[in-house]
């Protein structure tokens, strides 16, 4: 049995990992899904990491923007799932051309304006029922500065090959350039919604 700590990305919360957590629990693992204060202005990935706390005995998974957080967390293994990796120029280079549709409020927090836009921009490979359910729970995301390292040897990148947000080629090239292990998953940006069983099998293989 292993302990998994699943760290969400922008706009989401620990709720997004519900089905994945059930699958991992069925494998006999312990799972934590913390909620980060993504709406609070002025925080950094270091603040998020302090809220999660050191996890020296856990496999810590960061999805999407959560990759910048887990880089700062002591862990048995760090796993980057369709994630922004803590390297130079991440915001300029990581995203798929044309990704977007979110807007910003007067404080600079980004949000998805309606369910149709979220379905097209964030969840194109999800069912409409899945995307509507997720949209109803999304929060606003305060600006978050990019951070670098540590990243590389001992880390695992689960590259989501049909990702419409974080470019899969960038995920793979960046991981290889820094000596991280690459596992390719034929999935979109949110496989915890679309392929929770298959994703749990990948994580179980790391336990």
Where are these regions (language model features)?
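Conserved HGGG/HGGXW glycine-rich cap/lid loop of the alpha/beta-hydrolase fold
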Residues: 2-41
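Active-site loop/oxyanion-hole signature of alpha/beta-hydrolase fold enzymes
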Residues: 30-59, 95-96
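Histidine-bearing beta->alpha loop at or near hydrolase active sites
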Residues: 37-39, 186-190
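Gly/Ala-rich beta-loop-alpha elbow adjacent to hydrolase catalytic centers
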Residues: 61-66, 70
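Flexible "cap/lid" loop of the alpha/beta hydrolase fold
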Residues: 76-111, 115, 145, 166, ...
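Active-site nucleophile elbow and catalytic-triad environment of alpha/beta-hydrolase enzymes
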Residues: 133-153
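Short beta-strand/loop motif that positions the catalytic acidic residue
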Residues: 157-159
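Conserved loop-alpha-helix segment in the C-terminal half of the alpha/beta-hydrolase fold
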Residues: 161-186, 193, 205-206
């Amino acid at each position: 049995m292993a302990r998994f700590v699943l760290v969400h990305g922008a706009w989401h919360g620990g709720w997004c990992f519900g089905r994945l957590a059930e699958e991992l629990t069925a494998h006999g693992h312990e799972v934590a899904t913390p909620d980060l204060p993504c709406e609070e202005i002025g925080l950094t990935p270091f603040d998020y990491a302090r809220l999660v706390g050191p996890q020296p005995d856990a496999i810590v998974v960061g999805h999407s923007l959560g990759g910048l957080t887990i880089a700062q967390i002591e862990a048995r293994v760090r796993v980057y799932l369709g994630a922004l990796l803590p390297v130079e120029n991440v915001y300029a280079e990581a995203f798929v051309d044309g990704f977007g549709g979110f807007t910003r409020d007067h404080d600079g927090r980004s949000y998805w304006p309606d369910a149709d836009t979220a379905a097209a921009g964030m969840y194109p490979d999800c069912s409409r029922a899945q995307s509507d359910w997720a949209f109803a729970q999304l929060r606003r995301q305060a600006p978050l500065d990019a951070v670098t390292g540590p990243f590389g040897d001992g880390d695992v990148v689960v590259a989501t090959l049909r990702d419409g947000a974080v470019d899969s080629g960038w995920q793979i090239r960046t991981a290889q350039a820094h000596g991280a292990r690459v596992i390719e998953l034929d999935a979109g940006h949110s496989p915890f919604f679309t392929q929770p069983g298959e994703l749990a099998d990948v994580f179980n293989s790391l336990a």
